[in-house]
Amino acid sequence: MAVIDAPFTSFTPDLPRLNNPGLVKAHNCSAGLGPAPGTVTLFPLKSAALYSNTSMVSRPLGSAIGMDRDGNAKVYGACATKLYKLAPSTRVWTDISRAGGYATTATQRWRFVEFGSLQIATNFNDEPQQINMNVDLQFANLTTLVKGRYINTFKGFVLLGYTQDSLDGIVNYRIRWSGLELPGDWTFSPAT
């Protein structure tokens, strides 16, 4: 592919759009230091490159990154039936699913959230899953009391939204939360 140098004016997205003498949008490029002090040069984006030639058993349906207590990056991925971690030295997806696997339907996907040293995942069809990123061996059930389509954290709580439990079945407008700083405690209490 040939590279063509085209003289463009300066990149001035902070000026008003009307009668702006410079560029207000620049696609497929990244900014870098220019040849003179205070100037910016736009460089083309690097092309995509193969990072790993391994794959999951089916289409990826979610991924997450995290960090263990030693500062090592952790990469997790999910498909319909398995949860994986990416081994940094070999760049190979390793199956670390619970025994029995998972049953993610075609309309669902995996959603992840980091809580302390835990990486927590949910797909609504199976129990929420957790893995301690410091140990990093195998995912296990976070709880069997509630399932959720959406997951997040807020001030020491793990929240599940669009829930399913044995008391009320599927309730798309309900949010359930764990105990304070206890992501594995999902005991229902009328007081909360």
What role is predicted for each listed range?
Residues 86-113:
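A broadly used, surface-exposed interaction patch
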Residues 94, 103, 129, 168-169:
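A short local loop/turn or secondary-structure capping micro-motif enriched for an aromatic residue
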Residues 1-93, 147-192:
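N-terminal beta-propeller domains
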Residues 107-151:
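Hydrophobic or amphipathic alpha-helical targeting/insertion segments
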Residues 48-55, 93-102, 137-142:
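A short beta-strand motif characteristic of beta-propeller blades
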